């Protein structure tokens, strides 16, 4: 077997616009929320910051109590958007394992005065790049007592 490399192939970097992402995600969210308005499982859907902004602003999300965003591409900036969302203020369970969260992002989050997720009972952050000190800082924060 031989492999030939070379050539002048050109590849386009196609990144959909925010509006296109919002439209596509709304088409996914609508039937899921109609089926179960209190629980939403979006694990492994390549959700990153733009998609989190759509989720944060999508009014039907107000009824969701349990949100599974595990195994996605959620970073520290997206984490801020989730926790500062008025629409997601009723969340009781948030699953964020296997994402791109860091200890620094968690430390910045606990310092925020804009946190709206006051009803959280379950927060899963396993398999992220979190430090022991950032977890301790979160546990001692008034936001998470």
Each predicted region: which residue ranges?
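Leucine-rich tandem repeat or coiled-coil scaffolds
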Residues: 1-145
């Amino acid at each position: 077997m031989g492999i030939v490399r070379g050539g002048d192939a050109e590849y386009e970097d196609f990144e959909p616009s925010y509006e296109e992402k919002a439209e596509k995600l709304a088409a996914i969210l609508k039937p899921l929320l109609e089926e179960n308005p209190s629980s939403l499982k979006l694990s492994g859907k390549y959700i990153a910051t733009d998609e989190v902004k759509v989720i944060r602003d999508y009014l039907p999300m107000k009824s969701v109590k349990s949100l599974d965003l595990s195994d996605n591409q959620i970073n520290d900036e997206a984490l801020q958007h989730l926790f500062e969302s008025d629409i997601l203020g009723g969340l009781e369970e948030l699953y964020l394992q296997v994402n791109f969260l860091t200890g620094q992002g968690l430390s910045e989050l606990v310092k925020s005065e804009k946190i709206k997720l006051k009803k959280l009972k379950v927060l899963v952050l396993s398999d992220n790049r979190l430090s022991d000190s950032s977890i301790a800082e979160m546990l001692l924060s008034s936001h998470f007592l």
